[in-house]
């Protein structure tokens, strides 16, 4: 079985370009017994099915990788926005994550 044929356990479309018919997905999948977290670009083929491209990143899904990714996103967002704005817009999400 090829990596691109592995069934997805979970995915969320985090960007969609309707004009180019391209999606960027955050994907959690399992390959050879290891869970992976991927950020990958998908395209719409001629049969109107979404297919993965080689463009993206893939890493083992473990607590440290997930924590570092979350911390990196918060840091990047905080450079553009104040802590107050982050808490106002993402406070409920952050609280739900730590229940």
PLM regions and their residue ranges:
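N-terminal non-cleavable signal-anchor helices
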Residues: 7, 14-15, 28, 75-77
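Intrinsically disordered, low-complexity segments enriched in small/polar residues
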Residues: 8-9, 14, 34, 40-41, ...
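Mixed-charge, Lys/Arg-enriched low-complexity segments
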Residues: 53-99
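Negatively charged, low-complexity tracts enriched in Asp/Glu with abundant Ser/Thr
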Residues: 1-19
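A short, structured beta-strand/loop element
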Residues: 23-57
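Generic structural "secondary-structure junction" signal
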Residues: 16, 33, 59-61
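A generic structural micro-environment signature
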Residues: 12, 20, 32-34, 65-67
């Amino acid at each position: 079985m090829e990596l691109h044929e592995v069934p997805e356990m979970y995915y969320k479309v985090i960007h969609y370009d309707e004009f180019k018919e391209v999606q960027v997905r955050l994907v959690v999948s399992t390959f050879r017994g290891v869970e992976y977290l991927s950020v990958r670009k998908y395209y719409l083929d001629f049969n109107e099915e979404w297919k993965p491209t080689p463009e993206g990143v893939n890493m083992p899904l473990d607590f440290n990788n997930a924590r570092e990714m979350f911390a990196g996103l918060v840091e990047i967002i905080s450079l553009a926005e104040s802590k107050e704005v982050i808490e106002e817009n993402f406070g409920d999400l952050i609280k739900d994550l730590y229940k």
